[in-house]
């Protein structure tokens, strides 16, 4: 180990020692990470680069920064002069570069030390390469950290843990100030390079196997042939990041296109960039097979469609994918799409390929794996797991560091709930002081929610205006609730929000002020339950409700408790069961989360109750008037749940006699539905405003899908898991019941 200090500032002599370590990294195909915290970091960066260039004379370089900040372009240009192959990337656009790799990756952290960017860029580093993060001071003057700061108060718990682990882990070079270096070497003897393993008699073309970089990729090519057999089939590919799963599927799709077995293939993903590697490798595969193809690109250069003589593959957004038809659909980053979406696709298509990351910086796939287990009993399903990384060797020390410092694979202890629950607030300092406790608590959050990111861990540690409440059973955490203080805004803050300015620290007041124009709501003080999670083996035992009950007791001097989450039937039902009412549903789908945001509130003061009545009645009115347009793709059962649990401040008049006669004619089979559509709409609207009839959730969802959303019988059936005939039977019978009730 290099000593922790280097007296006299003779840092160049120490840096010269790294050449041998860099050579060993090339041999073992593993990476180094250098973290430089210094007022003059460029001198140290250049010295490290000098040593690295002795090992790799013409490296590919990726440089991440915020180009719009003072001096950032000057720093970038100073380093760019040294290289021929240099790509500079704006942090804000870095998602576009998923799948890119480089020998040398440099992160400018002078203005922003953001976990998401660190994880994404360091992951771009190839085996034998080095990632360099440089900053003047990791703790101060950083953009993401400012978003966690309120009234000048913020903590440093995330950074303290980051620095501590960086100094302790091997393969990491840590410079602090002008004369301190911490570094413990790694060895090529501890790594295993990826290797291809082509079957002796492959069924998939040898040219495609030759393009593979690992035995796992060869395995995917051969075993994916499962999808070509007769009958309804689901193929699942799971892996950690960097295993080449998207590339493997791209090569396999090129094989299908060359064979002409599937004329129309759809690819969808949370964003286009999640699946761009699939399209790159379709092209590489087709070229290796000497198959002629045509490419259609968007104005900004995205490959949207690839066609051969007998086949075509195109990317479509998730919403449009619901209404597409074809021979095969591929869903990349499937776990991010939500179980409801996946269920719809699996019901609608005979051939489905689900590709997803497990334990990556984009989230945990635990809920997805549970879904896959349930599917096994319903359809023919094959799950292929990929273990070997292709960008670097197995055993790479930097992957180990990233997983541990960002808790990417954190999992809670399996604890059998004994019926006794101790619920306490755990100070953030205690949480970050005890790594086992932190892993267990964060693991519960990660396993319960797919969309986690390294940023979430920094928020948990650094944001001061929050509570972390933990439920223990047998001395082990089984539930976690993260509460953020919101509201109590000044007139100036309310004016700013109402005029379009951001206020990220107050999510619920922000949405209700900006979009519902409930300006005075901002003055009320509230607690937003940012996350509540129960360990997987203990869900469905009432633990979450017990925790919420305790949180309500803790909320002294608070006007409201609320939560905001992606609209999901079971999640919304949980909140309603615990006395929370929906007051807001976003009008635009959050593409990143693949859903609409819902806000629920439990009023703890009379003033809040007035707002809840008003806002929830406006929400009901909006759903009744715009489900055919704004909420056409929303789950009809979810709409029913919202309509049944919101207030009504208006009523419809009596049902006109003409409408009664028309609906009777329809229920008796004398006229088709389209003839009586306006009468049905009037009657269904009246029902949800007055809620006097007792209908099943399936019956009401059928009414919502056909009457309020305007779906065809076929698409209504797909949404509800029913046949077209079953949906129409539900609608006829339900309209008959409503006539009896409201006339």
UniProtKB/Swiss-Prot annotation:
One of its GO terms (cellular component) is cytoplasm. InterPro entries: Acyl_CoA_acyltransferase, GNAT_dom, NAT10/TcmA_helicase, P-loop_NTPase, TmcA/NAT10/Kre33, TmcA_N, tRNA_acetyltr_TmcA. It catalyses: cytidine(34) in elongator tRNA(Met) + acetyl-CoA + ATP + H2O = N(4)-acetylcytidine(34) in elongator tRNA(Met) + ADP + phosphate + CoA + H(+); a cytidine in RNA + acetyl-CoA + ATP + H2O = an N(4)-acetylcytidine in RNA + ADP + phosphate + CoA + H(+); a cytidine in tRNA + acetyl-CoA + ATP + H2O = an N(4)-acetylcytidine in tRNA + ADP + phosphate + CoA + H(+); a cytidine in mRNA + acetyl-CoA + ATP + H2O = an N(4)-acetylcytidine in mRNA + ADP + phosphate + CoA + H(+). Keywords: Acyltransferase, ATP-binding, Cytoplasm, Nucleotide-binding, RNA-binding, rRNA processing, rRNA-binding, Transferase, tRNA processing, tRNA-binding. Residues 421-605 form the N-acetyltransferase domain. Acetyl-CoA binds at residues 532-534. Its EC number is 2.3.1.193. Belongs to the TmcA family. This is tRNA(Met) cytidine acetyltransferase TmcA 1. It comes from Saccharolobus solfataricus (strain ATCC 35092 / DSM 1617 / JCM 11322 / P2) (Sulfolobus solfataricus).
């Amino acid at each position: 180990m290099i000593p922790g200090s280097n007296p006299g500032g003779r840092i160049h002599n120490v840096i010269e020692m790294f050449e041998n370590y860099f050579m060993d990294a090339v041999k073992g195909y593993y990476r180094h990470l250098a973290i430089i915290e210094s007022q003059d970091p460029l001198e140290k960066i250049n010295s490290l680069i000098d040593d690295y260039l002795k090992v790799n004379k013409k490296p590919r370089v990726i440089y991440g920064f915020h180009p719009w900040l003072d001096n950032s372009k000057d720093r970038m240009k100073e380093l760019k002069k040294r290289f021929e192959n240099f790509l500079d990337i704006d942090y804000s656009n870095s998602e576009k570069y998923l799948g890119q790799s480089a020998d040398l990756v440099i992160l400018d952290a002078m203005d922003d030390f953001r976990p998401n960017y660190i994880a994404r860029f360091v992951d771009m580093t190839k085996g034998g390469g080095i990632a360099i993060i440089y900053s003047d001071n990791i703790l101060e003057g950083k953009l993401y950290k400012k978003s966690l700061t309120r009234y000048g108060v913020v903590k440093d718990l995330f950074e303290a843990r980051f620095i501590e682990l960086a100094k302790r882990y091997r393969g990491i070079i840590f410079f602090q100030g002008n004369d301190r270096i911490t570094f413990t070497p790694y060895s090529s003897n501890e790594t295993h390079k990826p290797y291809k393993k082509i079957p002796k008699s492959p069924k998939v073309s040898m040219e495609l196997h030759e393009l593979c970089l690992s035995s796992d990729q060869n395995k995917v090519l051969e075993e994916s042939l499962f999808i070509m057999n007769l009958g309804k089939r689901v193929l699942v590919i799971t892996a950690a990041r960097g295993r080449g799963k998207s590339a493997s599927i791209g090569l396999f799709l090129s094989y299908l296109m060359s064979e002409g077995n599937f004329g129309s293939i759809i690819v969808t993903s949370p964003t286009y960039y999640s699946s761009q590697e699939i399209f790159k490798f379709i092209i590489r595969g087709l070229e290796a097979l000497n198959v002629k193809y045509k490419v259609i690109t968007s104005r900004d250069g995205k490959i949207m469609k690839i066609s051969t003589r007998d086949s075509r593959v195109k990317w479509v957004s998730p919403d449009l994918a619901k209404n597409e038809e074809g021979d095969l659909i591929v869903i990349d980053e499937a776990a991010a799409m939500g179980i409801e979406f996946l269920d719809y696709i699996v019901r609608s298509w005979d051939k489905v390929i689900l590709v997803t990351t497990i334990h990556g910086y984009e989230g945990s796939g635990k809920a997805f794996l549970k879904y896959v287990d349930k599917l096994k009993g319903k359809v023919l399903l094959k799950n292929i797991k990929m273990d070997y990384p292709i960008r670097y060797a197995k055993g790479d020390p930097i992957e180990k560091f990233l997983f541990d410092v960002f808790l990417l694979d954190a999992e809670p202890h399996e604890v059998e709930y004994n019926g006794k629950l101790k619920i306490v607030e755990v100070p953030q300092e205690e949480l970050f002081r005890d790594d086992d406790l932190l892993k267990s608590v964060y693991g519960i959050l990660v396993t319960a929610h797919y969309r986690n990111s390294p940023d979430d861990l920094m928020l948990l540690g650094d944001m001061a205006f929050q509570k972390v409440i933990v439920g223990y059973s047998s001395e082990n955490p089984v539930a976690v609730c993260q509460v953020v203080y919101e509201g109590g805004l000044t007139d100036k803050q309310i004016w700013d929000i109402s005029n379009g300015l951001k206020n990220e620290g107050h999510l619920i007041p922000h949405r209700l002020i900006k979009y519902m124009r409930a300006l005075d709501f901002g003055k009320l003080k509230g607690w937003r339950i940012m996350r509540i999670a129960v360990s997987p083996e203990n869900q469905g035992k009432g633990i979450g409700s017990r925790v919420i009950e305790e949180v309500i007791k803790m909320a002294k001097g608070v006007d409201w408790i609320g939560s905001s989450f992606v609209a999901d039937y079971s999640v919304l039902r949980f909140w309603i069961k615990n006395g929370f009412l929906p007051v807001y549903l976003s009008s635009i789908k959050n593409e990143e989360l693949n859903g609409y945001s819902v806000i629920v509130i439990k009023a703890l003061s009379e003033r809040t109750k007035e707002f809840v009545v008003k806002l929830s009645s406006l929400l009901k009115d909006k759903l009744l008037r715009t489900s055919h347009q704004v909420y056409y793709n929303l789950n009809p059962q979810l709409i029913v749940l919202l309509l049944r649990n919101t207030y009504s401040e208006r009523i419809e008049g009596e049902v006109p006699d003409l409408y009664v006669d028309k609906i009777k004619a329809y229920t008796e089979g004398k006229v088709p539905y389209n003839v009586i559509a306006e009468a049905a709409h009037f009657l269904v609207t009246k029902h949800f405003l007055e809620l006097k009839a007792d209908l099943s959730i399936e019956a009401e969802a059928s009414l919502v899908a056909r009457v309020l959303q305007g779906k065809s019988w076929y698409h209504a059936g797909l949404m509800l898991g029913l046949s077209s005939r079953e949906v129409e039977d539900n609608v006829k019978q339900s309209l008959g019941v409503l006539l009896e009730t409201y006339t």
